[in-house]
Amino acid sequence: MKRTAFAAIAVSTALLCGCADSLPFTEKPAYHEKNCTMNAEISCGELSAQAKVTRRGEGDWEFAFTEPKELMGVVVTLGDEGVTASLGALSVTAEPSAVYNMLPQIIARAVDALPDTPADKISEADGILTLENECADGRIVVTAQKSTGDLITLKCPYQRLAVCFSDIADEICESADTEEVRIIE
């Protein structure tokens, strides 16, 4: 009787655990998979720039440069059509290897790859996640808030690239059917 009761408890515990999305000790933290707008201070060697960055989804990014003054107003868009650069009404397909076009591509690829980061390449200290990835651009290290998934920094030593993110806001849009405003997550 005791064996039957023990077996029933063991089987029901296993079944209940199997219904959960993930086990508590193997759960991957949520990183930056949301659509959002943020400011980015970008430095690459002696070059530096600031941009308002909008992520609309994987592979769909916009970098609106605000500094230096030579780039102010230039918008680099990454999407299905490739890389385009525009200034006002003038829009051109950008040379992907140009430095100010290459940097947004590295940043976008690195952030889009965060959900695929292996668990052994993720560490945490004081609520800050550090994620390390290898890609064609070399080793990339990203830090993010564990609680929100908001990006803090991105570094790619091979390209001498460092990015500091700030003022991260979830992208807000209006519903097409009503005038209600909702946050896209």
Identify the residue ranges that each predicted region occupies.
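Positively charged n-region of N-terminal signal peptides that target proteins for export
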Residues: 1-5
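N-terminal leader/targeting segments and the immediate start of mature chains
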Residues: 10-60, 70, 94, 168-185
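Flexible, processing/modification-adjacent segments and terminal tails
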Residues: 29-31, 36, 40-42, 85-138
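A short, compositionally biased
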Residues: 36, 78-81, 126, 146-148
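An acidic-aromatic
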Residues: 53-113, 159-162
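Gly/Pro-enriched, hydrophobic low-complexity segments
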Residues: 62-67, 118-185
